[in-house]
Amino acid sequence: MFDKIHNGTFVGGNLTTAIRAKTVDGGAVIWGGVRDIEQMQKIDTQVCFRGVDPTPIRACVMTEYNGPCRIGKAVCLPGDVVMATQSGVLFIPSHLVAEVINQAEKAHVKDIFGFEMLQRGIYSTAEIDATVWSTEMLERMQTFIKEDPRCEKYVDVDWSLELDAAQGEEKAFTELMKYHLV
């Protein structure tokens, strides 16, 4: 929709209802507008959009079906997995999903540990936000993971790459940097 909101309301109450009925857990990402927002909010379907307008869709042409599309500064390809939260939308190429999940689990458990350590005054924000943690921090985190019930499902996460980077191994550091936005 190229950010069209007025006369660009691709999704409304009817299409949201159809998405819910046909897919159960599907949703929509629209780089444009929606309408019938009150009806949409009553349906348990996630729809990400740029704005709300009461006008119907007009002066739009479908250029491709099941092909690549540009949404903002991102490109979504057929088969990509869509991850959407209140913070934004990610398009994950299907061949990278396992790797992304692994890194997301690591980030999540590091957040649980990091927030706890900040609250206790054990580490500073600079230490928690560092790309490479010290060996002592990583070992303390591994102990924390084993003891804290919030981390139960992360007990088997492999931290060897992070430990190698903490010990100054250049290959590990280079590999670790691939997972950090610069």
What label would you give each PLM region?
Residues 82-83:
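Generic structural signal for buried aliphatic residues
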Residues 1-78, 91-182:
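Feature captures the catalytic cores and cofactor-binding loops of soluble hydro-lyases/lyases
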